[in-house]
Amino acid sequence: MDVFEKKKVLDSFEILVDTREQDTERAHKRYASFGVPIRRAALNYGDYTYNATLPDGKQIHDISQTVIPVCAVERKMNLDELAECYTRSRKRFQNEFERARDHGCRVYLLCENASWENLLNGKYRSRFHANAFAASVTAWLVRYNANLIF
């Protein structure tokens, strides 16, 4: 690809939002801050991924089918929700990460309104002990080759 083709691909960049992600006014405000077009699509795993039109006119992902991304963002609104994923919803959470791993996808686990400091100091609403929570998160990142972003 020459520089003009690369620019055209970048100009066509859009974020795909999973159809299971809640379609709220707050979400629309968040999407507007991204500065790129947003389109809803059924993702096999994750809450967000990307799409773009290649120089041959084809899109990276055919959104008429379930999208199987190579890179995805799994968003949690806070540590409370993340703690629930490692306790009550663990099997569902694990299945999603296993599907991603089986397809060679890199998952970025985005936990909003949080920090390692808050996690380690138990500043969340759950009876999940801070040491067990930190150990679960760390093991998860290694097991599924994921990255955690606060």
Residue ranges and their predicted role:
Residues 24-28, 37-45, 50-150:
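Extended, alpha-helix-rich binding/interface surfaces that flank or overlap catalytic cores
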Residues 1-25, 29-30, 137:
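Interdomain/boundary linker segments immediately adjacent to catalytic/signaling cores
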Residues 33-34:
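Short Pro/Gly-enriched beta-strand edge/turn motifs at strand-loop
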